[in-house]
UniProtKB/Swiss-Prot annotation:
Name this protein carries in UniProt: Small ribosomal subunit protein eS7
Pfam families in the cross-refs: Ribosomal_S7e (PF01251)
Lineage: Eukaryota, Metazoa, Ecdysozoa, Nematoda, Chromadorea
Record keywords: Ribonucleoprotein, Ribosomal protein
Gene Ontology CC terms: cytosolic small ribosomal subunit; small-subunit processome
Family classification: Belongs to the eukaryotic ribosomal protein eS7 family.
PROSITE patterns from the UniProt entry: RIBOSOMAL_S7E
InterPro entries: Ribosomal_eS7 (IPR000554), Ribosomal_eS7_CS (IPR047861)
Molecular function GO labels: structural constituent of ribosome
Source organism per UniProt: Caenorhabditis elegans
GO biological process, one term: rRNA processing
Amino acid sequence: MPEIIGKLLKSDGKVVSEIEKQVSQALIDLETNDDVQSQLKELYIVGVKEVELGNKSAIIIYVPVPQLKAFHKIHPALVRELEKKFGGRDILILAKRRILPKPQRGSKARPQKQKRPRSRTLTAVHDAWLDELVYPAEVVGRRIRVKLDGKKVYKVHLDKSHQTNVGHKIGVFASVYRKLTGKDVTFEFPDPIF
């Protein structure tokens, strides 16, 4: 049986960290708030991770994939309140996604019960995390620049209309994405062509 601690649902045998307890308690406290009370009642989280970014830190809250849309509805109010509670640390909400290994070929291959779904591939999970990381901004374009030494730099173009909302956080987005995936990414707000 999964263990339920406040708003946190942990799978069997997993130890609950102190930051997870704090975020779970903060979500319970926010349920009494009028802004998000009705929507937050049905929602829960499955994990919390704190990422150190030089002199700052960010808190990544993992939620179940089916509940991600519901979290997006209350995202601005929820993030604002949680950032107040945690002393200005940046709060990011991501879906907990699983990456399945590539099926092996040749003599090492084991028979598979079913084909690996596209949503469980490394590329699909990394792309989905990128979209969730910059929410409420929208990714309008992506470019991959391969340098002469073979290193790849990902350029992500965000919607110019959201620059005031998330413009100050793009350094945090890049650092967290590098920690999660190992990919260097830069965010830009290009002017619309048309």
